[in-house]
Amino acid sequence: MDRRTAIGLGLAAAVARPALADTLVVGDGVLPGDPKENILLWPGLPPGGEGLSLPPIRVHNHEPPFLTPTDRAIDRIGLPVMNVFRPDKPDGSAMIIAPGGGYSREMLDFEGMDVARRFNGAGITCFVLRYRLPGEGWANRQHVPLQDAQRAMRLVRGNAARYGLDEAHIGFMGFSAGGHLAASIATCFDDNVYKAVDAFDQVDARPSFSVPMYPVITLGEGAHVGSRNNLLGPNPSKELVDFYSLQTRVLADTPPTFIAVAADDTVVLPLPNALAYYTALQVSRVPSEIHLFEAGGHGFGLARTVGRPTAAWPDMLLRWGASHGFFKNAVL
């Protein structure tokens, strides 16, 4: 099925909110291992895509050492989608999950689908976000990931009844550059970064809770240079750098936040990133918790935690979420 024949989003005539069509799949956007249910983010051309023609989505292995046979990275994302992972026993909560990859690719499995399946086991409905990459030709590249994150939050919350969700229990998790996106939607949820395309865009985009994992936070001193350049371009203005240095964007309405990071992370340094963000959360009195593991490196996700203290982070998150009333099946 090509894009022209894909089923789009429709507005329900007799209800206050729009409803999703039954199936949202597109030919080159469906990959092996995708669940049966996939939500196309935009009903037409995504913002900033005028005149852009991307080749089909590219799937390749992560660099060695390979972790699993399905340790995939993807790029050339012209059609942003959410893969829907429904639990057998839903508890009414949900998480949108944004894989990392330095804003140049996305680690589809160990920071995406594997994570979704893990939290399905706790009753959480998960949506793995395949967001557009800013350096692939989109206009206003700096806002492209945030556009998709805002739209994803609005689609999930706008269809809470369809998925059996509590609108107040919908969070956003991200890893590395995806952690930057998680912090972006937590602090910039009401920034006007695209023109409304339908009634979903009137829905609140603020996450109920935020989970930036070993996140990129600052784009100034101490930044992960690759993520900064891929998001903002090679010579960004100070205004842009400040806008997306998210430790400066925290306010009292930033949602409750759980952070996990390893002290020996030499890729995205904890001090100017995760720890600076946690400090800003504390200054603004945002309910927040950070776990600074002695060892674990960068990008531990799920696959690199076996036999290590970092293996505890999913249960720590579940207990934290339960303490705030977001998750019902976690044991405190």
Model-identified regions with their sequence ranges:
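Short beta-strand element of the alpha/beta-hydrolase
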Residues: G92-G100
